Amino acid sequence: MNIKLSFISIAFLSLSFNVAANEFEKSQEHYKSVTDLKNKIEILELEKKITELSGEIRNARMPKIDKSAPVLSPQPVVKSSEELQKSIEHIEEELKVELAYLVNNGQQKKYTFNLNGKLITLVNGDFVNGWKFIEDQNKIQFSKGNKVIDVN
């Protein structure tokens, strides 16, 4: 009788060990899947932050556009050709150009200028407001007709 009881208790113990081992394996699989899901969530959150930051950077680079309609006067304003010539000369005299930075990739030089308060990027031969950008060795100039502006 003792042998039967010991045999039954040994069988019961081995069965309970097998069940415990199976439960342990299942819990390990669940732990691994939970850890993988946590890692995926962290990756998605980081990707979301990256896209938000790149959007903020893109918005900061883009100039703000005033979408309000310009106010038009009901009567057209007629100016004489002398007044127009004076205003054109006045505009040309106020062309203020400063070199912000230069990017040289070995094939092409791209110059970024602060032009009347706005940043623009130009390469040799580009036109801006009727002015041609000329880069000749170490000289940087804007020319329009017989007028030349040297950039220091």
Swiss-Prot record:
InterPro entries: Toxin-coreg_pilus_synth_TcpS. It is found in: Periplasm; Secreted. The toxin coregulated pilus (TCP) is essential for successful colonization of the small intestine. Keywords: Periplasm, Secreted, Signal. Residues 1-20 form the signal peptide. It comes from the Bacteria. It comes from Vibrio cholerae serotype O1 (strain ATCC 39315 / El Tor Inaba N16961). Pfam families: TcpS. Its main location: periplasm. This is Toxin coregulated pilus biosynthesis protein S. GO terms for cellular component: extracellular region; periplasmic space.
